Amino acid sequence: MATEAQPAKQAKLLLVEDDVLIRMLLADMLDEIGYTVAAEAASIDEALEATRKTDFDLAILDADLDGRSVSPVADALVARDIGFVFVTGYDDHGLFAYRDRPTLKKPFQIDALKRCCKSALSSH
């Protein structure tokens, strides 16, 4: 019985989300659409460390980490010229300086995640 070949991994991602269950779900979704999660972070400090120590092509950022804005992480990514996508449960992620960045409003479907990642990767 033949099995379907798995798609080649397209890119390595940094996943920044403070809710462990959402982070696990996002990691599974990213794997399903062919991306490799290079590192995960649950806090701003962990995310900043990952930006310094991990090789990745794109970041998925929860806009609010335990009540703190993720803007220091976004600033670090801009300095390294690495694209990112915001995910948020709010209507507005509150990061005016980054209003032009792709944003997914939770909950979202896997197809929306795939389109958003592809778009963010192609623009960087």
Language-model region placement:
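Non-catalytic signal-transmission and effector/linker regions of two-component phosphorelay proteins
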Residues: 1-12, 109-124
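Conserved acidic carboxylate
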Residues: 17
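Two-component/phosphorelay signaling modules centered on CheY-like receiver
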Residues: 20-39
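Acidic, metal-coordinating helix/loop segments flanking the phosphotransfer/catalytic sites
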Residues: 40-58
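Active-site residues of response regulator receiver
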Residues: 62
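Short amphipathic alpha-helix used as the core "switch/output" element in two-component signaling
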Residues: 68-82
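Hydrophobic/aromatic residues positioned on beta-strands within the core alpha/beta folds
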Residues: 87-88
